[in-house]
UniProtKB/Swiss-Prot annotation:
Pathway: Carbohydrate degradation; glycolysis; pyruvate from D-glyceraldehyde 3-phosphate: step 4/5. GO terms for molecular function: magnesium ion binding; phosphopyruvate hydratase activity. Keywords: Cytoplasm, Glycolysis, Lyase, Magnesium, Metal-binding, Secreted. The active site is at E205 (proton donor), K340 (proton acceptor). This is Enolase. (2R)-2-phosphoglycerate binds at Q163, K340, R369, S370, K391. Gene3D superfamilies: Enolase-like C-terminal domain, Enolase-like, N-terminal domain. It catalyses: (2R)-2-phosphoglycerate = phosphoenolpyruvate + H2O. SUPFAM superfamilies: Enolase C-terminal domain-like, Enolase N-terminal domain-like. It comes from the Bacteria. It is an enzyme of class 4 (lyase). SMART domains: Enolase_C, Enolase_N. Pfam families: Enolase_C, Enolase_N.
Length: 431
């Protein structure tokens, strides 16, 4: 047993230059843990509350001093004295202390920072890597990376409607080789864009952010890059999209406006037709948030039409929330959940969502946020839970590469017992 003797939070910066919460946990044994909380740009309306100060004189109102103070003045006194290995008990105590259904009193960013730092301190105490401490002896599966190499929507200042266009190197024999394949395609894409006279600046998640004629054109240039790198689209490398359609859903009309393509007033059925057409023309294996988070009828139609052969990931749809996920499972909506620790606010609840998804035959994709830091906790979570997939950005920006590098270390440490399933991690669809 190692008792927590101090908890301390401070305001630091994320990859977009916005403040976020860093938490440190100290124990009587000398074990120590530190964690930094990520932040999203396109957020689901049902997410746990990220507490911002709203003081326009500091960081344009995005300061997090209130969340920091909540850790130092409210949460710390509550959990000092806990055994650092009592993760569930500590998380439960913070949830009860907050007392709201969405962590709106203390802030999910305050609670999550403590939850993650506690896990790091506990792993330090028992002398295990974080993934082994959280996942036990069976934690050995390296995730298939979903690499966002073209950014659009809320993640870039361009005219592309869809938020992310990803490559998935499912044909690699190991995680290390999947990273090499992804990096080679990324560099090939830069050359393709340059040769077309297009911008090669990168967006929030490290992908390129060119102005393109359509969302279809984004897929076309990625196919060209895959082939230029010497790989075969639909064999070695598949495509994925995070549409983030809530960002271009018009609540007043109940329609979808693809402004970048000059197509407005699209119905849910027309959006589903569009996705089905794209999936016939391109080797798309995963679509995230294809319809608005509250358009459950649209999601149901999409699942009925292509859910047997395409992974349909719920991000804003499920917000890492077991109640929302249970509703989706009951109604047969989507077949996968995106796991973002700050959408729900504790590691305990995060693990519960992954477990529920797997029991129902849904896949789980551990994910970063667009506002990231050097913290690589999600890499360990992906291996600890054998989630099978991770979405943590492109092959540039240290805030993204930090997660890939941590996974490379874990694979090296696991040695011969490391597993990389590639295409088999999409176990609930037919390819």
């Amino acid at each position: 047993m190692s008792t927590i003797i101090d908890v301390y939070a401070r305001e630091v910066l994320d990859s977009r230059g916005n403040p976020t919460v860093e938490v440190e946990v100290y124990t009587e044994s000398g074990a120590f843990g530190r964690a930094i909380v990520p932040s999203g740009a396109s957020t689901g309306e049902h997410e746990a509350v990220e507490l911002r100060d709203g003081d326009k004189s500091r960081y344009l109102g995005k300061g997090v001093l209130n969340a920091v103070n909540n850790v130092n003045e409210a949460i710390a006194p509550e959990i000092v004295g806990f055994d650092v290995t009592d993760q569930a008990g500590i998380d439960r105590a913070m949830i009860e202390l907050d007392g709201t259904p969405n962590k709106g009193k203390l802030g999910a960013n305050a609670i999550l920072g403590v939850s993650m730092a506690v896990a790091h301190a506990a792993a330090d105490f028992v002398g295990l890597p974080l993934y082994r401490y959280l996942g036990g002896f069976n934690a050995k599966q390296l995730p298939t990376p979903m690499m966002n190499i073209i950014n659009g929507g809320s993640h870039a200042d361009n005219n592309v409607d869809f938020q992310e266009f990803m490559i998935l190197p499912v044909g690699a024999p190991t995680f290390k080789e999947s990273i090499r394949m992804g990096a080679e395609v990324f560099h090939a894409l830069k050359a393709v864009l340059h040769d077309k006279g297009l911008n090669t600046a990168v967006g929030d998640e490290g992908g390129f952010a060119p102005n393109l004629g359509s969302n279809r054109e984004a897929l076309e240039v990625i196919i060209e890059a895959i082939e230029k790198a010497g790989y075969k689209a639909g064999e070695n490398v598949f495509l994925g999209m995070d549409v983030a359609s809530s960002e271009f859903y018009n609540k007043e009309t109940g329609k979808y406006d693809l402004a970048g393509e000059g197509r407005t007033g699209l119905t849910s059925a027309e959006m589903v037709d569009f996705y089905e057409e794209l999936c016939k023309d391109f080797p798309i294996i995963s679509i995230e948030d294809g319809l608005d988070e509250n358009d459950w009828d649209g999601h149901k139609l999409l699942t009925e039409r292509i859910g047997d052969k395409v992974q349909l990931v719920g991000d804003d749809l499920f917000v890492t929330n077991t109640q929302k996920l249970a509703e989706g499972i009951e109604k047969g909506i989507s077949n996968s959940i995106l796991i973002k620790v700050n959408q729900i606010g504790t590691l305990t609840e995060t693990f519960e969502a992954i477990e529920m998804a797997k029991r129902a035959g849904y896949t789980a994709v551990v994910s970063h946020r667009s506002g990231e830091t050097e913290d690589a906790t999600i890499a360990d979570i992906a291996v600890a839970t054998n989630a099978g997939q991770i979405k943590t950005g492109s092959m540039s920006r240290t805030d993204r590469i930090a997660k890939y590098n941590q996974l490379l270390r874990i694979e090296d440490e696991l040695g011969e017992i490391a597993v990389y399933d590639g295409i088999k991690s999409f176990y609930n669809i037919k390819r």
